[in-house]
């Protein structure tokens, strides 16, 4: 679960596109996963926490986040994932009640009985390439958890 759609996502109506989506695809591929594509099944399901991009790319307001939280909880219940990955502080704040992603990343939590791993977003990694080694550690932890399931 990401935070909000990027510009490219908003224009095309699909999540995780553009350069950050390409990096996310590489990250998933590095641990043997891929996003769903036409005719190709996948164990990966991607969704932004907020389904729209706020005007001027501003941070969503607390009322917008609070309004969407029940919808995301229901979305998660319907998708019935075995593992959740939160890629962004907004999603962490809404679902864990904690927003400092740099402190949360790398630690496992539970959300309604589902193992949950906060990770740095691919968008953040494009802005701060030095954080990629932290993301790699998180990806390896995710891979290890998925192999046990």
List each language-model region with its residue ranges.
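A polyanion-binding, active-site-adjacent surface
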Residues: 1-149
């Amino acid at each position: 679960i990401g935070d909000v759609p990027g510009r490219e996502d908003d224009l095309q109506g699909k999540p995780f596109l553009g350069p950050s989506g390409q990096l996310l695809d590489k990250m998933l591929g590095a641990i043997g996963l891929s996003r769903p594509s036409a005719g190709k099944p996948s164990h990966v399901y991607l969704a932004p926490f907020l389904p729209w991009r706020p005007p001027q790319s501003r941070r969503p307001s607390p009322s917008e986040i609070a309004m969407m939280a029940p919808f995301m909880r229901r979305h998660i219940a319907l998708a019935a994932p075995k593992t959740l990955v939160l890629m962004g502080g907004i999603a962490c704040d809404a679902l864990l009640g904690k927003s400092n992603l740099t402190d949360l990343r790398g630690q496992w939590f539970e959300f309604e009985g589902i193992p949950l791993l906060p990770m740095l977003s691919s968008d953040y990694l494009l802005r701060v390439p030095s954080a990629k080694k932290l993301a790699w550690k998180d990806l390896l932890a995710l891979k290890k958890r998925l192999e046990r399931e």
